[in-house]
């Protein structure tokens, strides 16, 4: 049993009717005024009813989770399992980049949200790392893939531009913040999808894995606007800021698709259960992927693809994504969060 998390339970305002998240949208950066032609920013939720973003303690027991945690669906299982390959290194990188940018934040509300975001992402990284350990215990070793992911985030997207490329430090930081904002657009969409993916329950999916995915997905919806607001705050002003935001999505989309297909292919090829089935190396199949989509076990291409033109709108703000109410309701009921809270309570009484 693992029991991880870096802070106290998240708290909320008086009522979770919070579909307008406390986002800052197209606001000006530090010390700026809004630029002519830019849409007004969405109003922030006033204190004290503001939704507070903070990490939660969670506890997952992987002992009884099978390798194919969606029964009879190795393709759907491994397409979703790519999350575990990408997120430990990716979310550590989010935290590192945000730490670099913290001195630029002069908005107390945003600073509080960013610190809560960093705590949540650090917790996500730890929990998905435990799934990699569980896969290794089932003889599915992922290190040959994850070392490339580590190289991407630690070297190519590290604190210094790769290969000595002469990019000013401030611009390199802004570029990486734009990448995180674009990635978080997809994680919010995926988070909202998994919260409503009843087909996963009907397919008999492992309850522990579903709880991990839905707990994580709910927190992605919960902090859906923070990375965008951070970029808007630190990313300069006017048209250059907007153009860099578009550039971030233009880079993230093909790279993320490539990593996902590569990751799913890797998992299929190295799956010991599939290798035992007979001659021929198992492969990722787009046909099988689309069949899983049709059964509701994976998000549709339209659900994922439509997130891109929405993000390109000048007036866009991520508070439009998903249902914060549904996310809050799941977080209040998550078995992992409740188990960890109960363990803390029992320890306090001893």
Regions from the PLM with identified roles:
Residues 2-8, 13-15, 21, 33-350:
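Non-heme di-metal
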């Amino acid at each position: 049993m693992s029991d991880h998390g870096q802070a106290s339970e998240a708290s909320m305002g008086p009522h979770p009717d919070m579909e307008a998240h406390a986002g800052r949208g197209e606001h000006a950066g530090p010390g700026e005024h809004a630029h002519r032609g830019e849409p007004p920013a969405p109003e922030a939720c006033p204190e004290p009813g503001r939704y507070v973003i903070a990490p939660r303690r969670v506890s997952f027991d992987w002992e009884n989770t099978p390798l194919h945690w969606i029964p009879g669906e190795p393709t759907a299982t491994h397409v979703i399992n790519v999350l575990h390959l990408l997120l430990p290194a990716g979310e550590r990188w989010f935290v590192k980049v945000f730490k670099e940018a913290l001195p630029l934040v002069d908005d107390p509300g945003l600073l509080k949200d960013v610190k809560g975001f960093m705590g949540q992402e650090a917790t996500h990284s730890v929990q998905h790392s435990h799934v990699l350990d569980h896969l290794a215990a089932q003889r599915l070793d992922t290190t040959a893939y994850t070392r490339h992911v580590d190289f991407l985030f630690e070297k190519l997207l590290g604190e210094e531009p790769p290969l000595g490329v002469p990019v000013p430090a401030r611009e390199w930081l802004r570029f990486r913040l734009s990448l995180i904002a674009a990635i978080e657009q997809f994680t919010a969409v995926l988070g909202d999808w998994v919260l409503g993916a009843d087909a996963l329950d009907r397919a008999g999916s492992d309850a522990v894995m579903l709880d991990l995915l839905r707990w994580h997905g709910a927190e992605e919806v919960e902090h859906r606007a923070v990375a965008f607001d951070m970029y808007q705050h630190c990313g300069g002003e006017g048209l250059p800021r907007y153009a860099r935001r578009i550039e971030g999505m233009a880079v993230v989309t093909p790279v993320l698709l490539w990593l996902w297909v590569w990751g799913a292919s890797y998992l299929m090829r190295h799956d010991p259960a599939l290798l035992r089935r007979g001659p021929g190396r198992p492969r990722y199949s787009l046909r099988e992927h689309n069949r899983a989509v049709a059964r509701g076990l994976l998000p549709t291409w339209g659900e994922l693809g439509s997130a891109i033109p929405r993000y390109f709108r000048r007036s866009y703000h991520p508070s439009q994504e998903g249902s914060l109410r549904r996310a809050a309701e799941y977080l209040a009921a998550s078995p992992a969060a409740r188990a960890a809270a109960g363990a803390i309570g029992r320890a306090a009484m001893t």
